[in-house]
Curated annotation (Swiss-Prot):
Subunit structure: NDH-1 is composed of 14 different subunits. Subunits NuoB, C, D, E, F, and G constitute the peripheral sector of the complex.
Function: NDH-1 shuttles electrons from NADH, via FMN and iron-sulfur (Fe-S) centers, to quinones in the respiratory chain. The immediate electron acceptor for the enzyme in this species is believed to be ubiquinone. Couples the redox reaction to proton translocation (for every two electrons transferred, four hydrogen ions are translocated across the cytoplasmic membrane), and thus conserves the redox energy in a proton gradient.
Family from the record: Belongs to the complex I 49 kDa subunit family.
Keywords attached to this entry: Cell inner membrane, Cell membrane, Membrane, NAD, Quinone, Translocase, Transport, Ubiquinone
Catalysed transformations (reactions): a quinone + NADH + 5 H(+)(in) = a quinol + NAD(+) + 4 H(+)(out)
Protein name: NADH-quinone oxidoreductase subunit D
Gene (UniProt): nuoD
EC number: 7.1.1.-
Domain of life per record: Bacteria
Broad class of where this protein is predominantly found: membrane
Subcellular localization: Cell inner membrane
Length: 410
């Protein structure tokens, strides 16, 4: 008897009803509104979807396995390629997990923590502006796309001025940050923060009460609270279903317990409610950054943790002190050796809970590296979310989930 091929894609074993009234349609993986390499197999009765099966894997790069074959510092730039719209969030989540594994989280200098938080919240604004621009364009609002990219460009210029990269930042290091803020950077940041609230009002003026926008989003993609919990939704996908949960509040990291901000929640449970949350979250990020600016000015100019067994010394010390040079050589050529143990660290990325699980056996590279990416779960929910809707609503629903395939196909 012929043995079944275990690598056979599971969707080929799905049974679709074939009759004169139903048809099976492929949505993607080259569809411009698929937000990456998403393929949906849709069974349709006329224009109405009766069954939906997401098919992923078109961007798979073996990222977790790559992480298990690299020393810890080598893998950090690779995390940029997950959610490439918010690269700093990936860098930071991995760095924080390694720091907690090493036991040096509390040794990270306060200035480094402030800089990290500014970059994280600026990255959140960039990600939300990109979401709003592309989502509005998918639904047909061309002008909003242009306005959002204008403000996003200014924020990306700020990031570029700090780390030299526009998209894949690598702006965080295990143990701190590589650079202090450039001279005049905070002044330019203040100009941006003063201008952005008026621009958010402009976007809302174009969309919030727009009749077509509301018709396309209201009562579309409804996620009841129970469904959100069953599918492990997080971020705005969870808060948009009336569940108040934000890791920055529930399990504070860095200095989030020292800043004052609100958690926007909506009980609408639909795409329109999630849109309202994205707008409010940008305002909360502005509020957080405004509190961080005076905190930065009060800190000492130290950027990296002092942990010689894991973290290289300052460049000046490496060039002038024999011991620092030898330690640096060992760390670069062989890598740090964390103690035996395991850790899972969740963070609140712009799209939801981004967490890293690391299992160490005392070697310079992880024994096991597992990435918990929010977009993976938010893609899975489509099979329950799409049936009952019409084909025209598919683009709206995919847009409201805010998925990116760099972190789905790892």
């Amino acid at each position: 008897m012929q043995q079944r091929n275990r690598l056979e894609p599971y969707f080929e074993n799905l049974v679709f009803e074939r009759d004169d009234n139903k048809m099976v349609v492929n949505f993607g993986p080259q569809h411009p509104s698929a937000h990456g390499q998403l393929r949906l197999i849709l069974e349709m009765d006329g224009e109405q979807i009766t069954k939906a099966v997401p098919d992923i894997g078109y961007l798979h790069r073996g990222m977790e396995k790559m992480g298990e074959n690299m020393i810890y510092n080598e893998f950090l730039p690779t995390t940029d390629r997950m959610d490439y719209i918010a690269a700093t969030s990936n860098n930071y989540a991995f760095a924080l997990a390694v720091e907690r594994l090493l036991g040096i989280e509390d040794k990270v200098p306060r200035r480094a923590k402030v800089i990290r938080m500014i970059l994280l919240e600026l990255n959140r604004i960039i990600s939300h502006l990109f979401w709003l621009a592309t989502h509005a364009l998918d639904v047909g609002a061309m002008s909003v796309f242009l306005y959002c990219f204008r403000e996003r460009e200014y924020a990306m210029d700020l990031i570029e001025d700090y780390c030299g990269a526009r998209l894949t930042h690598s702006s965080v290091r295990i143990g701190g940050v590589p650079l202090d803020l450039p001279e005049g950077w905070l002044d330019r940041l203040n100009v941006y923060l003063n201008n952005l609230p008026d621009q958010i009002k402009l976007y809302e003026g174009l969309l919030t009460e727009n009749r077509i926008w509301r018709m396309r989003l209201e009562e579309v993609g409804v996620i009841p609270p129970e469904m959100a919990k069953q599918w492990a939704c997080s971020g705005i996908m969870l808060r948009g279903s009336g569940i108040e949960y934000d890791i920055r509040k529930e399990e504070p990291y860095e200095l989030y317990d020292e800043v004052d901000f609100d958690i926007p929640v909506s009980d609408r449970c639909d795409s329109y409610g999630r849109y309202l949350l994205y707008m409010e979250e940008m305002r909360q990020s502005i509020r957080i950054i405004r509190q961080l600016i005076p905190m930065y000015k009060e800190t000492e100019p130290q950027l990296m943790a002092h942990a010689p067994e894991y973290i290289s010394a300052h460049k000046e010390d490496i060039m002038t002190q024999n011991y620092s040079l030898m330690q640096h050589f060992v760390l670069v050529t062989q890598g740090m050796r964390p103690p035996v143990g395991e850790v899972y660290v969740p963070t609140e990325s712009p799209k939801g809970e981004l967490g890293f699980f690391i299992r160490s056996e005392g070697e310079p590279y992880p024994y096991r590296l597992k990435i918990r990416a929010p977009s993976f779960w938010h893609t899975g929910i489509l099979q329950d979310l799409l049936p009952g809707h019409y084909l025209a609503d598919v683009v709206t629903i995919i847009g409201s989930t805010n998925i990116v395939f760099g972190e789905i196909d790892r």
